[in-house]
Amino acid sequence: MQIRQSVKFKKPLIHYITNPISINDCANMILAVGAKPIMAEHPLEVSEITSISESLGINLGNITDNKMKSMLISGKISYEKKIPQVIDLVGVGCSKLRLDYAKKFILECHPNVIKGNMSEMKAIYGIKSSAKGIDVGACDIITEQNFDENIEMIKRLSMETGSVVAATGVVDIISNGTYTYIISNGCEMLSMITGTGCMLTGIIASYISSGNILEGTALAIVLMGICGELSQHVKGTGSFRNELIDNIFSISDDIIIKKIRINSY
């Protein structure tokens, strides 16, 4: 929990290039964990913005030519200046443009964290996936039958890229190739409002600013899962969204420790 308190105390500046669908919620989620968001995306300014930031988030949702240029510029600056960065592989399972771009970004920018659902992870690893748009395909969902093989794939992807790999879903798998965590927190309603994955990437970017990449990533995923569970009593998805942000802001370390469901593998 030291990472949480450090972020709240230091209020790191997080540069997050994301999509217009979820940008407001992403900025508010970064604020909720105690960091400061800046969502600049113009190709002529992102180099300067990334350089003064303490972490970088890259989200491939709703990409445009300009954003593709900006993301690559920021990613390279982040790598050169050793600023922690996370890429969210939104849609690489259903779009060749995004898949090819993601491979180029990973090769040239060396992100500290690669995040996505299992369909996106299979696509980036070169395995046929069954993505349903930006959502995980039914055949790619982690089950008891494919649990071990999916963990091995995530570990291999981490070792090949040198990145912490975070595969999110009903069960979350986070690995740096040596240490692997399995997280079972969360609820169905997290998949019923748009942008929760994008919001999570903002939290990951905030927490890896501490330099603790594996632990910061795992903590962000645990936090989102537990706060989803705490928020699901509400009337519907609109109030769930608001309750989720409130719980991210107000949850205590004691509740996280009490409700966390995490195992090493």
Swiss-Prot record:
Organism lineage string: Bacteria, Bacillati, Bacillota, Clostridia, Eubacteriales
Keyword Plastid: no
Name of the molecule in the record: Hydroxyethylthiazole kinase 2
Functional note: Catalyzes the phosphorylation of the hydroxyl group of 4-methyl-5-beta-hydroxyethylthiazole (THZ).
Keywords: ATP-binding, Kinase, Magnesium, Metal-binding, Nucleotide-binding, Thiamine biosynthesis, Transferase
Record: residues binding substrate: 39, 195
Organism whose genome encodes this protein: Clostridium botulinum (strain Kyoto / Type A2)
A biological process from GO: thiamine biosynthetic process
Sequence similarity: Belongs to the Thz kinase family.
Pathway(s) per entry: Cofactor biosynthesis; thiamine diphosphate biosynthesis; 4-methyl-5-(2-phosphoethyl)-thiazole from 5-(2-hydroxyethyl)-4-methylthiazole: step 1/1
Gene: thiM2
GO molecular function: ATP binding; hydroxyethylthiazole kinase activity; magnesium ion binding
Enzyme class: transferase
